[in-house]
C-alpha cells in the first residue's frame, strides 16, 4: 500500500511513524516532508507543494491513500480535487475546511447549531469594529478570521490595545488577507483543552485530551507560537468536563455537519476553554494539531491506519479506539529568536542517541534537513522530544532529560511544559 502524507512538520513525522507500523504499508511519500524520511523505512520525500502537483503525482504513482496535514491545502480544496479524480484522501472537503479557514464562518456555524461558545461579532468594516469596542469589557479577544499559522489571536487588555490590534490586522495587514475579516469576542478566563477527534460525518470519536503551551516563554508569557509543547492526557479533562463537552459541543457539531451535508472523513480538533466549570468551544481545526499529534499518537494502541480506513468506509460506529494508560510529554526545541527571526542551517548533535524503534522516547523532526548523513536546523520549531511514561511527572522528567542530549547553536525550549497544571479532582 502506498501512502502520501502532505505537510512538512513534526505532526507529519508522527503520522508517518504511526502509519508505518501497519504491515500493509510498503511505501510512504512525504510532500514535501522533512528529514524524517531518513529515519522511517521506505519513506521518500517529494518536492511538491500545490494541490494540482500533489494530485498529478498521486495519479501517476497510483497512491492508495493521501493524508493531509496542512490546513492551507485543505482550505484550498485539495480533498475535492482528489475526490473528483476518484482518489482516496483523508481530510475535510473545501466546505468543511472553512470551519478552520474562516473563524467568522465557524462562529456562525456554532451559533446556528447551539455549540457553546463565547459571545462574538464579526466585522469587515474597521470603523464598525472600533465602535463595537465601546460595548466590550476588557480584556477582549480579537481574531483574524483567516488562516494565520496559529498566531492570529490577540488578547487586548484595554481599548487602546484593541484598536491598535484592529489597525494592525485590517489596515496594516500583518496577517495579509487573513485579517480582512475580524472576530471580536468576549474573553474567557480558564484552562484550555485540546481534543482531537475523527469523524466519518456520521459519528465523531474523540481521541485522548491534550494541553498545548502556545506562548514562547515560561508561565504562558510572550509571543504566540505554533505551540511549544504538549502534555496528554490533559489533567483538567475530567469526566464531568468530558460529559459537558460531548453534550454541548460535540453532539451539536455533528448535527451541524449532517444538516449542512459536509460529507467527509477526517479530523476535527476541538480547541476548548473551561471557565467557571463550563466548557466552551474556542475554535475548530480540521486537521491534526501540531504539536498535539506528537503526544497523542504515541499513546494510541489501536492501528491508526485501520482507524482512518474505518472513517473512510463510514464504519466508525463499529470500532473502538484503544489507548495506553500512560502519559505523554512533548517538548519543542526551537531555533533561538523564534517566532520572529532565527537562523537556519545549524548542525544538530545528539540525535544518534535515540533509537527510532523506541516507542517510549521519541524525537520527531519539524524544521530539520539532512545533508551527507548530518542533520541541520531548517525552521523555527526544529524538534519535538516526546516521552511516554506511567505518570505525567515521569513523562515530563524523561522528556527534559532527553532534551539535554540534543544540541545546536542557539537552541531554545520552554522549561515548564506540563508543570503549570494543578491536579484536578472530578
Where are the language model's segments positioned?
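Solvent-exposed alpha-helices and their adjacent loops that cap or buttress functional pockets
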Residues: 21, 38-39, 90, 112-114, ...
